[in-house]
Amino acid sequence: MLQPKRTRFRKQFKGRIHGVSKGGTDLNFGAYGLKAVEPERITARQIEAARRAITRYMKRSGRVWIRIFPDLPVTSKPTEVRMGKGKGGVEYWAARVAPGRIIFEIDGVLEDVAREALRLGAAKLPIKTRFIQRLAE
């Protein structure tokens, strides 16, 4: 699963996702992509599950690019622990995804294969997404 090799600080604030994505809104690598429509935190496990679903449907043909990276440590305290005594330990890593952000890109497969593969991948994610494709040049 994806996570940073090292970070400056072990823990971060929750933060909020305001407005639309500033960058990463256009297809840079592949011909087809999956674009976020709503804001949400996506965990490293969800990204990996979606990636596996996409590559499995494509039968290892073509190429997949993951355009988001889980760099946000999410902490939680153990169950039945009283309030206070500091912040909990890091449980998992997540990526903040704003509307308009490209999550996955695909190339080297037909459009109907790409559409179905990304539909299966989108089912593993907690947000609404949209299938997009590069305009014919």
From Swiss-Prot:
Record's GO cellular component terms: cytosolic large ribosomal subunit
Gene: rplP
Keyword ATP-binding carried by entry: no
Alphabetized SUPFAM superfamilies for the sequence: Ribosomal protein L16p/L10e
Function, in words: Binds 23S rRNA and is also seen to make contacts with the A and possibly P site tRNAs.
Name under which the protein is recorded: Large ribosomal subunit protein uL16
Subunit structure, interactors included: Part of the 50S ribosomal subunit.
Keywords tagged on the record: Ribonucleoprotein, Ribosomal protein, RNA-binding, rRNA-binding, tRNA-binding
NCBIfam families given in the database record: rplP_bact
GO molecular function, one term: tRNA binding
Family: Belongs to the universal ribosomal protein uL16 family.
BP term (GO), one: translation
One Pfam short name: Ribosomal_L16
